Amino acid sequence: MSTSIHERIRVEIEDLHEFFCNWFAGKLPKADFDSKFTARFAPDLVFIPPAGELLGLADLSSVIYDGYASNPKFRIQIREVTVRQEFDSYVLATYEEWQHDALASKPPDNGRVATVVFKIDNPLKWVHIHETWLPKTVMASDKYDF
């Protein structure tokens, strides 16, 4: 697997999660939503959060948009980005997402592992995201000091 695709994947994952922190803090203009959020995803995106619901792009966009400026203390740290497979024009990757003061999550300090599929394009497109909680013992061992 090429180093450049791994770097592109890592940067894209970190950039999207930085968007979340800034969006929920109200630090971005609302007019930036489509260019900084919606445009990152394939139109037929599938997102499965830890609770197991199946969301498409319209549903996910609505939830994120409605959360604007709702949680200024929210923080995310991305860890362990790993490219698992490259096939045709797609990449399968995993990463850990650690959240601090996530008011919409139970518990608000939490960790999850995500499996994602990207379409290799310019820019990369998120096609599929599946998150699951990290074990409670793992979550409890973190200091959440990011």
Model-derived regions, located:
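Short, low-complexity N-terminal intrinsically disordered segments enriched in polar/charged residues
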Residues: 1-39, 43, 144-146
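A solvent-exposed, acidic/Ser-Thr-rich amphipathic alpha-helical stretch
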Residues: 31-89
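Generic short beta-strand segments
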Residues: 43-44, 94-101
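Short hydrophobic/aromatic-rich beta-strand segments that constitute the beta-sheet cores
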Residues: 47-48, 93, 128
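Hydrophobic/aromatic beta-strand elements that line small-molecule binding cavities or substrate pockets
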Residues: 64, 78-84, 96-99, 112-120, ...
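Short, cysteine-centered beta-strand-loop-beta hairpins and adjacent loop/turn segments enriched
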Residues: 70-73, 99-110
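Short beta-strand edge/turn micro-motifs at domain boundaries
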Residues: 109-146
